[in-house]
Regions:
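Active-site-adjacent mobile loop/cap segments within catalytic or ligand-binding domains
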Residues: 19, 24, 28-39, 74-132
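Active-site-adjacent substrate-binding region
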Residues: 54-79
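Catalytic-core regions of hydrolytic enzymes
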Residues: 1-58
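Stable alpha-helical elements in mature extracytoplasmic
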Residues: 10-17, 55-59, 63, 106, ...
Length: 132
């Protein structure tokens, strides 16, 4: 089955992501995304979790707190969600929405290398705090 190609279903592609995390017996799973909205004024960071372990919410809070405190964009908070990859994987997992591609200000931010590096560093700091 071509799980990453044009013939793969959404479920096959999502399950392939879960399989990678499970294959390597990961301690946690972080799925990174860029959000979009028909409302061009909506923006901000959000982190989603599914409460299948005692640590999903804590991981989400640690990452979201780092992101929210360091950028001039809206903090959309930590939210519970039923997303496939964070629900189906066995370890603590989060899905991070890093701003909105549909918001011109945030699109400009996301194109900057400094933003990409800082976002990666802040997510890593949230993960470090989770393990502390």
């Amino acid at each position: 089955v071509d799980v990453f190609g044009p013939n793969a279903s959404d479920a096959e592609e999502l399950q392939a992501r879960v399989n990678v995390g499970e294959k390597y017996n990961s301690d946690m799973f972080v799925s990174l995304h860029i959000n979009s909205s028909v409302n061009k004024n909506v923006g901000g960071f959000s982190t989603y979790y599914y409460p299948k372990t005692d640590n999903d919410l804590r991981l989400a809070q640690n990452i979201q707190n780092k992101l929210a405190a360091n950028f001039g964009v809206d903090d959309l908070g930590v939210r519970q969600a039923n997303f496939y990859v964070i629900k189906r994987i066995s370890m603590p997992a989060v899905l991070v929405e890093m701003c909105f591609i549909s918001n011109e200000k945030e699109l400009t931010l996301m194109k900057g290398q400094w933003f990409q590096k800082k976002t990666a560093r802040l997510i890593a700091e949230g993960i470090e705090k989770y393990f502390a």
